[in-house]
Amino acid sequence: MAQGFAVGFDPLGLGDLSSGSLSSLSSRGHLGSDSGSTATRYLLRKQQRLPNVPPRGIRASSPMGRVILINSPIEANSDESDIIHSVRVEKSPAGRLGFSVRGGSEHGLGIFVSKVEEGSSAERAGLCVGDKITEVNGLSLESTTMGSAVKVLTGSSRLHMMVRRMGRVPGIKFSKEKTTWVDVVNRRLVVEKCSSTPSDTSSEDGIRRIVHLYTTSDDFCLGFNIRGGKEFGLGIYVSKVDHGGLAEENGIKVGDQVLAANGVRFDDISHSQAVEVLKGQTHIMLTIKETGRYPAYKEMVSEYCWLDRLSNGVLQQLSPASESSSSVFSCASSAPYSSDSLPSDRMDICLGPEEPGSRGPGWGRADTAMQTEPDAGGRVETWCSVRPTVILRDTTIRSDGPQPGRCLDSAISESPKTALLLALSRPRPPITRSQSYLTLWEEKKQRKKEKSGSTGEKGALQRSKTLMNLFFKGGRQGRLARDGRREAWTPDSGSLAKTCPRLDMEKAGGMGPVQKFVTWRLRRDRERGRALLSARSGSPSSQLPNVDEQVQAWESRRPLIQDLAQRLLTDDEVLAVTRHCSRYVHEGGIEDLVRPLLAILDRPEKLLLLRDIRSVVAPTDLGRFDSMVMPVELEAFEALKSRAVRPPALRPARQDTPPKRHLITPVPDSRGGFYLLPVNGFPEEEDDEELRERLGALKVSPSASAPRHPHKGIPPLQDVPVDAFTPLRSACTPPPQLPHVARRPPRPNWLLTEPLSREHPPQSQIRGRAQSRSRSRSRSRSRSRSSRGQGKSPGRRSPSPVPIPAPSMANGRYHKPQKARPPLPRPLDGEAAKMGAKQGSSENGTGGTAEEAAMKTPSGELKTVTLSKMKQSLGISISGGIESKVQPMVKIEKIFPGGAAFLSGALQAGFELVAVDGESLEQVTHQRAVDTIRRAYRNKAREPMELVVRVPGPSPRPSPSDSSALTDGGLPAAHQPLDAAPVPAHWLPEPPTNPQTPPTDARLL
């Protein structure tokens, strides 16, 4: 039974989705994006589906930016394809899972288990070779790349997997290459039927001759372009000849093959070497053979098949029937590979991430249909993957060296070669009847009638030409002659009048714009009336426009319309516009054409396409078409005109789209002020470097049984052991993180602070509030300036801590107004009394310095603690810093469960941090301590992390319980990913009772 498998591309993802949920496992899982779509035509053949088996659709996203749609009943054929098994696999004490995977959406496949180690935890859990992993820890792997799947599988020590027992593993087999040639004689594209070399397929009886070309050193131009080379598996062919050039004068034609030049054979020479031989020579002797064709592009078809698993776990091909003949028709092509270098045996596909340099700009889209007829006894499922089109470049032989040809996706007006290829690939218009409505006998009879009417029947009733006489100039005889050549139509004549198309051509020579417009309006009204009356009379000749003419006009205008549509619309919209226009040309119905077009062309730029679509509308439908389209076109014209004329400075402030909003947060500095920075405004170059290192670690050594392929275009399938990433990750890359839908902005913690002034008169408070409302004052850096002239200078601030001045640009520092956050409750009365007592003592100068000296004196023993960096987060929050007068040292405020600090058990809340990985944390600011600890924990190359802490002694020390209570109770810190930006803090005003600053705390990950 023949089974069909179709492979295509769905640019907007409108194809059938799989039954599983489509999950995006990593926002950075792709290695690149599509650099340009090639204009390939779609040749999709109908596939024969199995009876009573619905096809399964898989939409997969490729790292090259493609989207592959595979309609294949491969999984439904299996007896156990619908059985879902739940498998729980835990890592061994050595950190191994014990199985390898293969596949990935970049190959249009799912994630399959290809190897299971004996005695591993995966084997004990019941995982088998050939199982398809559909879900891991609640995340679907139906449409997932191999890189994202490996991150999910290695990101947790316990995996709860849902597998489908398929019993087979996908493999790959390479088939032959095919070259598409441009037949110069017949002006069409020819696809070779076999994978033989061009020298075998070319005509051996071609005329060979020797041509001598003489040039000068001043004016070196041979006047022809060459195409081909050894890297493409082709010879050197002439693809273009300059008109009137040296090559054309000596008889060189397009399609000739260059066999040798100055004694150098071109049978086995690269393109660049051929250019070097030809250029720079004043006398060139060429050996030319007339072949009448030159290569357009190449294609290489790779066929996927399935490997069956045996009892010992060794993979074997299901059936040799996959070697059966297959007919593949496609206009896609591959990267330049030689057919001799392709391996004929089967090899695995490397599923690791590719290097960015292995992708070229020629990747595009292609559609392929494949029909395979295996043996009746075997059961084989294959699908075909066709490489994207790569147009072979042309090189002009000039003194300045080769110039690469243009790609297929360039405009027709910019590339004559591309226009020629497209023109040759289009089918020829069908041979139709002449455009004349009259036969030869009828035409002679009509001439006699016109002659007799113009000479002998002067008094016959003629149609009034009063309106026409107002516009047309000339003598009366000319008008009568034109009137005599025109037949009047009456309803009782029973047939339509024959209008001569030569009449309009004769009038066009002596008409102005107004006359042409009136003529067009009269002809349109007359044809509309004829259509209405003929529809009423039921005449079979009611179809005024000839269908063959309209179809022919549509076929001639179709390439230009599609070219403009591809510049303005998406691929699906281009197909929809083409489908509606083709349906109108063959079936009619102007309303059915205009309504969907107006729905698709929903922007002023897109409405420019209506100008070209108007050319395929029948004359009888032009009035209705204009009445429906003209208002929309006028609005679009006004919109485009306003965009082009109005300068950017004069555009209104309010636009259709709302302005972008940026979340800002204050970041403290060492002088008591703060900066306003965006929440997500931190650079991500470090994260990109970490991602590249992580992707580079996914490379594995090639399989011993699989032969090495010298090219990087189609990666061979390889087994990816998931355990190979654990040591690499611990050595050089951060641990993989679970994918998330969208990164939430980090929740900032509270930074409790107080101003440093010692006097707080009521007048200054009132004056400070007025300053905050007017937003014209900024915070001063010096306490001495704040005590004098508080309202005289705009650069000085009030010592009142309650109001916070409005944002200003003084010294490049921003300040947040008081309305940004509601005030927190005041401290307890007892604490306020203590703080007041301290304030009084400090003001009197009795005891303030002693207390500060006691607090600054370090007490306690030093202790070195080592922490493992294998966990995703450190899990501590710290408080204090040099900017705090209460707690200038950095202390551990809280330890969060699940972090590295919690699992070690050696750290406790209240420990003072002295150094981390040899870098001191004494006499540093709070933000400097946060950055130092983050940087040390992210450096996975240094394992483990060494922390020097000071265990508090028996002497009483002030505890930052207030800040801890406010931080932990009022605003709990959120769990953040590893590569999140440093958590900033906000200023929070406190009552003016404590002249000192409480410690700050921040969450460290």
UniProtKB/Swiss-Prot annotation:
Function of the molecule: In cochlear developing hair cells, essential in organizing the USH2 complex at stereocilia ankle links. Blocks inhibition of adenylate cyclase activity mediated by ADGRV1.
Gene designation per UniProt: PDZD7
Repeat as UniProt keyword: yes
PROSITE patterns xref list: PDZ (PS50106)
SMART domains to which the protein is assigned, alphabetical: PDZ
Cell compartment(s), UniProt: Cell projection, Cilium; Nucleus; Cell projection, Stereocilium
Gene3D superfamilies, alphabetized: 1.20.1160.20, 2.30.42.10
Region (Disordered): 353-378, 700-859, 949-1005
Xref: InterPro entries: PDZ, PDZ_sf, PDZD7_HN-like, USH2_Complex_Protein
Bias (Low complexity) ranges: 787-799
GO CC terms: cilium; nucleus; plasma membrane; stereocilia ankle link; stereocilia ankle link complex; stereocilium; stereocilium tip
Gene Ontology terms describing biological process: auditory receptor cell development; auditory receptor cell stereocilium organization; detection of mechanical stimulus involved in sensory perception of sound; establishment of protein localization
Predominant place of localization: other
Biased segments, Basic residues type: 770-786
The keyword Oxidoreductase is assigned to this record: no
Protein name per Swiss-Prot or TrEMBL: PDZ domain-containing protein 7
Start-end of Pro residues biased regions: 989-998
